[in-house]
């Protein structure tokens, strides 16, 4: 009886071992040959990029497409603002600086913005300092070499909001 138990146990152990080898040989590491840059991580053979990076291997800063001199065409009601404005690198990979030419030289100082993928956001700020009577905030979306903007310039006192829309190319 002991001998039958030993044979049955050995057979079961052999089948289990063969099954484990067969299973692991069929499950290849999809990330084995994938190299993700800039702290990206590989999941199922595809790089998941860290914030601020994009591309197949996370090789490109997301803000790169925004960094240039743009020809701007903004509208506020019946008024058309046509001007040139530059966007440059900010302090980290998600930040950019918009030159003071923004909104046809409305502000004396630069404007800080953040980039997340194809979206550029101007968080609410007073570019000309706390003694200035004006604030700005807004969002733009990048597509096919253009940024479509909606931004608001707010006069603090007396209170008034001016919503601008525009296309930069």
How would you describe each model-predicted region?
Residues 1-26:
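Sec-dependent bacterial lipoprotein signal peptides
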Residues 27-31, 58-67:
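Short domain-boundary/entry signatures in modular proteins, especially
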Residues 29-39:
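Disulfide-braced loops of extracellular cysteine-rich modules
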Residues 39-42, 83-91, 109-117, 137-144:
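Short, exposed beta-strand/loop patches in secreted or surface proteins that constitute
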Residues 40-51:
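Extracellular cysteine-rich, disulfide-stabilized repeat modules
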Residues 62-82, 98-99:
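Tryptophan-anchored aromatic micro-motifs
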Residues 73-77, 114-169:
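Beta-sheet ligand-binding and adhesion/scaffold domains
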């Amino acid at each position: 009886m002991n001998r039958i138990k030993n044979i049955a146990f050995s057979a079961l152990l052999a089948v289990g071992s063969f099954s484990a080898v067969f299973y692991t040989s069929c499950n290849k590491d999809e990330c084995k040959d994938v190299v993700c840059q800039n702290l990206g991580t590989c999941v199922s053979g595809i790089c998941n990029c860290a914030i601020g990076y994009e591309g197949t291997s996370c090789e490109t800063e997301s803000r790169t497409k925004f960094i240039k001199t743009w020809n701007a065409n903004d509208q506020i009601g019946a008024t058309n603002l046509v001007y040139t404005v530059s966007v440059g690198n900010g302090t980290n990979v998600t930040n950019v600086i918009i030159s003071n030419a923004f909104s046809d030289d409305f502000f004396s100082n630069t404007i800080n913005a953040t980039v997340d993928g194809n979206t550029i956001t101007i968080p609410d700020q007073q570019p000309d300092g706390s003694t200035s009577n004006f604030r700005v905030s807004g969002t733009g979306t990048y597509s096919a070499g253009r940024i479509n903007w909606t931004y608001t310039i707010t006069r603090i006192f007396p209170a008034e909001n001016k919503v601008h829309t525009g296309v930069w190319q």
